[in-house]
Curated annotation (Swiss-Prot):
Region annotated GAF domain, chain positions: 1-156
Keyword Cytoplasm found: yes
Record-level GO cellular component terms: cytoplasm
Main localization category: cytoplasm
Keyword Cytoplasm attributed: yes
PANTHER family tied to this protein: GLOBAL TRANSCRIPTIONAL REGULATOR CODY, GTP-SENSING TRANSCRIPTIONAL PLEIOTROPIC REPRESSOR CODY
Listed HAMAP family: HTH_type_CodY
Pfam families on file: CodY, HTH_CodY
Full protein name: Global transcriptional regulator CodY
Length: 258
């Protein structure tokens, strides 16, 4: 049975996982490709390939390079996709490659459908379908737009999760800084101002002499940060202490104090 209902049920089996775990975008693309016999590309707002699936016997080295190797569409092409506000179905191939500067398209009878992915009023990405020799019918478009809606919800959930994680990291750093004494805070400001990037070598005695504090103040400050999971430190004996920042919000919060 290949009715719209049966296809939707197959899709729902994937989507029902979304309550407990993230949806695998590749699974959605694979299913859509199977039931509609087409290429499927799930593209993020900035052109990143979130998922894809090629139909059988599809041969286009240019597209495969963009999707499989680069994992991103060129900016000019993605801008064209983003500017499309409503579903456009059954766009015929005009004989020119969709990527600028490539020239002639060697694949004939290609028909494309572009479905915007929107969530909470924001454009989140694009669902791009390509078929050869057969137009997409109404059932195909219903399934594609349903999938785009679900993907939009998942992208919104992922975005919210990122926002919550950012807030958590920031709160952890603020709490860690709040446990420092004035002299310890002064010490960490000097320590991390001398780091090149997210990690580096610290010689506590040199910083202690430079700032005019005891070495124990530096050691205590680092222990507090390490206990909070903000940094990781490893003694290298006479060479000093190797420090690695684990929470990227640390430097931003220290800059606010200055």
């Amino acid at each position: 049975m290949s009715t719209l209902l049966s296809k939707t049920r197959r899709l729902n089996k994937i989507l029902q996982k979304s309550g407990t775990e993230a949806i695998a975008f590749g699974d959605i693309c694979q299913l859509l490709s199977d039931v509609m016999s087409c290429n499927v590309y799930l593209v993020g707002r900035k052109g990143r390939i979130l998922g894809y699936s090629f139909s059988e016997k599809f041969e286009c080295d240019i597209m495969k390079e963009k999707v499989v190797v680069d994992r991103k569409f060129p900016e000019d092409y993605n801008n064209k996709l983003i500017n499309i506000q409503d579903t456009i179905a059954n766009i015929p191939n005009k004989g020119i490659c969709v990527f600028e500067g490539v020239g002639e398209c060697l694949i004939s009878k290609k028909i494309s459908t572009i479905v915007p992915i929107v969530g909470n009023g924001d454009r989140l990405g694009t669902l791009l379908l390509a078929r050869f020799g057969e137009e997409f019918n109404d059932d195909d478009l219903v399934l594609a737009e349903y999938s785009a809606t679900i993907v939009g919800m998942e992208l919104l959930r992922a975005r919210q999760g990122e926002i919550e994680e950012e807030a958590r990291k920031k709160a952890v750093v603020q709490l860690a800084i709040g446990t420092l004494s004035y002299s310890e805070l002064e010490a960490v400001e000097h320590i991390f101002s001398e780091l090149n990037g997210d990690e580096g070598l610290l010689v506590a005695s040199k910083i202690a002499d430079k700032v005019g504090i005891t070495r124990s103040v530096i050691v205590n400050a680092l222990r507090k940060f390490e206990s909070a999971g903000v940094i990781e430190s490893r003694s290298l004996g006479m060479k000093g202490t190797h420090i690695k920042i684990l929470n990227e919000k640390l430097m931003d919060e220290l800059k606010k104090i200055k």
